[in-house]
Swiss-Prot record:
Keywords: Acyltransferase, Lipoyl, Transferase
Protein name, UniProt field: Dihydrolipoyllysine-residue acetyltransferase component of pyruvate dehydrogenase complex
Record's compositionally biased regions (Low complexity): 111-123, 177-194
Upper taxonomic lineage: Bacteria, Bacillati, Bacillota, Bacilli, Bacillales
Organism, as annotated: Geobacillus stearothermophilus (Bacillus stearothermophilus)
Amino acid composition bias (Basic and acidic residues), ranges on this chain: 89-110
Length: 428
């Protein structure tokens, strides 16, 4: 009897995830804690280790497929472990019981109405729903009981489009799900015919998560963006002075830690920027902590690791942590815990050569600070035209919560601190 390894409960409220990559194949020998696969959810890519030592017999869930907690992913020849259970198996047993009940109900429905589609019989208040956490939240926000919605995604998964169709009084046809199951996951080959050849490929789990988060934020929060710039002559000199000292400590000192400190000070001065809105209860959540998300551009997509308690850390410590999290983001090693709990976010388009832009709020946060490149520009100082390094700043905010004048005052506060690093350190 083979040992069945099921998708474990990895915490963070995650009930399912996409199998991004398998690191083993049938016939491979694995040891305990060897990485079996990578699973992508709404928050991060998580490595799933083997709980036992044994030989891989069969991979049951291929790459690109969404699996639920408790679903068997792989079978192993691991003598002595055949009857061992792990966290998440209870969900699988419940799933089997529900499946039996569903079959029984379908038989009764068929006896009354043999021509009724089976897909319609599956939707109901007692069925088990497969849906990403973001879709479940979207359903709650729209006042929809997701158990009543017929899913058209792979394995009957409920998509955001299914919620919209339900609200519109209809549902997507069930055959679409069957077609998706039968369709190959590989990209369609390019056609050499015609003037405009095209290819198609499946969206990655991270790209889908980013797309859903961006659409949800723009649809939920009325965005307003203020654009300004700060004279960072003194800041450039300050960084230059301490850059070598930081290097001696093995730290790469950038301008980002200074921006983090300035933003934290602004959040303290204007606490409305450090809030969120509970759309279900219509309550304002005032956050009494300062966790700053740092948007990181990676080959897999945009990830946002979080600097916890940024108000308690000096510049060098912030620089070190930012560098470490950025490296983990690029290597795909971030854990869900390192990407949760942000109260406000910074995004940097300056590293790509950009200046002003309209950053999208990382909902449910209510503000996001965008920083652009530092460019030499002519300015008037003490009645004379001089060249000065100017830092482009873009502050997007949720107008439901923050008034324009308040946002501009907060941006002015940030500008003042970045223009005077000594004052910034006094504030910090």
């Amino acid at each position: 009897m083979a040992f069945e390894f099921k998708l474990p409960d990895i915490g963070e409220g995650i009930h399912e995830g996409e199998i991004v990559k398998w690191f083993v194949k049938p016939g491979d020998e694995v040891n305990e804690d060897d990485v079996l696969c990578e699973v992508q959810n709404d928050k991060a890519v998580v490595e799933i280790p083997s709980p036992v030592k044994g030989k891989v017999l069969e991979i049951l869930v291929p790459e690109g497929t969404v699996a639920t907690v408790g679903q068997t992913l792989i079978t192993l020849d691991a003598p002595g472990y055949e009857n061992m259970t792990f966290k998440g198996q209870e969900q699988e047993e419940a799933k089997k019981e529900e499946k039996t009940e569903t079959v029984s109900k379908e038989e009764k429905v068929d006896a009354v109405a043999p021509n009724a589609p089976a897909a319609e019989a599956e939707a109901g208040p007692n069925r088990r729903v497969i849906a990403m956490p973001s879709v479940r939240k979207y359903a709650r926000e729209k006042g929809v009981d997701i158990r009543l919605v017929q899913g058209t995604g792979k394995n009957g998964r409920v998509l955001k489009e299914d919620i919209d169709a339900f609200l519109a009084g209809g549902a997507k046809p069930a055959p679409a799900a069957a077609e998706e199951k039968a369709a190959p996951a590989a990209a369609k080959p390019a056609t050499t015919e015609g003037e405009f050849p095209e290819t198609r490929e499946k969206m990655s789990g991270i790209r889908r998560a980013i797309a859903k988060a961006m659409v949800h934020s723009k649809h939920t929060a009325p965005h307003v963006t203020l654009m300004d710039e700060a004279d960072v002559t003194k800041l450039v000199a300050h960084r230059k002075k301490f850059k070598a000292i930081a290097a001696e400590k093995g730290i790469k000192l950038t301008f980002l830690p200074y921006v983090v400190k300035a933003l934290v000070s602004a959040l303290r001065e204007y606490p409305v920027l450090n809030t969120s809105i509970d759309d279900e209860t219509e309550e304002i959540i005032q956050k009494h902590y300062y966790n700053i998300g740092i948007a990181a551009d990676t080959d897999r997509g945009l990830l946002v690791p979080v600097i916890k308690h940024a108000d308690r850390k000096p510049i060098f410590a912030l620089a070190q942590e930012i560098n470490e999290l950025a490296e983990k983001a690029r290597d795909g090693k971030l854990t869900p815990g390192e990407m949760k709990g942000a109260s406000c976010t910074i995004t940097n388009i300056g590293s790509a050569g950009g200046q002003w832009f309209t950053p999208v709020i990382n909902h449910p946060e209510v503000a996001i600070l965008g920083i652009g490149r530092i460019a030499e520009k002519p300015i008037v100082r003490d009645g004379e035209i001089v060249a000065a390094p100017m830092l482009a700043l873009s502050l997007s905010f949720d107008h439901r919560m923050i008034d324009g004048a308040t946002a501009q005052k907060a941006l002015n506060h940030i500008k003042r601190l970045l223009s005077d690093p000594e004052l910034l350190l006094m504030e910090a």
